[in-house]
Amino acid sequence: MPLTRSEIWRVEKYLRNLFRLDTITLIERTKGDSVEVHVAGEFIGVVFKDEEDGEISYAFNMAILEMDLPELPASRTK
């Protein structure tokens, strides 16, 4: 289900307030079923809209690649 422009603005505002990060932006996708989430211009995930039993919710999906994780300090391996 596509997000309207007002929903995109509201979800973007919510995420900015939640994470205290003004560099979060939501960008419409050509598919229309979701929007991309960017932080400082870098893609980090996708928001999908769901409507079930008359209630609307928004799901934020973010994949984290293992290669992007920091190395584990030696003190944490024990």
What are the language-model segments listed below?
Residues 1-78:
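Terminal leader/tail segments of proteins
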